[in-house]
Amino acid sequence: MELKYVELERNMGAFFDSVIGTLNHIFIGDIIWLSRFKDHSDKYTALLSLEQYPAPNALNDILFTDINDLWKSRIELDETIIRWLSETGESDFQKDFLYENTKGLEFRKNFGEVVSHFFNHQTHHRGQVSTLLKQLGKDIGVTDLIVDIPDSQRST
C-alpha cells in the first residue's frame, strides 16, 4: 500500500484529525503510560529506554512527520513493551497504581486494569486509522486479531 504524505496529513475529521495525527497520538499515549509504569516499579528496566523519545507537550503533538521514522520508532517501542511485559509478574497486576494524569490530577487504580486500558487505547485508535485508510481508498486487508492467533494442537 502506498500513501502520499498529503494523504497521511489530510484532516479527515477524526479525533486527532489525520492518519499521521492519530498514529502520533497512539505513540504519545504509549510514551505517557509507559513512563508512568516505569515509575511504578524499579524492576521495569526495559522502560529506561523511553528516554530516547522526545517528551510530548500535548496529546495531539506531532512527534513524527515522516511515516518511515514513525514506523521505525513504533517497532522499537513495541519491542520495549514486549521486554517490559516479560519483567512483570502476576502479582504486579493486583497492586494499586498511583499516577497523575496530563492535567496533574492524582489517581489510584488497579494496575492490571490500567494496563488493560493502555492496550485498549491502542486498539481504539488503530481502529480509527483503519477507517481513515478505508476512506482514503486503501485496502489494508483483514485486521481481526483472531487471524493471527495460531491454532492450538490438542491431543485427544
What is the role of each PLM region?
Residues 87-102:
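Acidic catalytic patch
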Residues 5-55, 101-156:
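Short, contiguous alpha-helical
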Residues 2, 10, 35, 69-72, ...:
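Charged/polar, solvent-exposed surface patches and flexible loops
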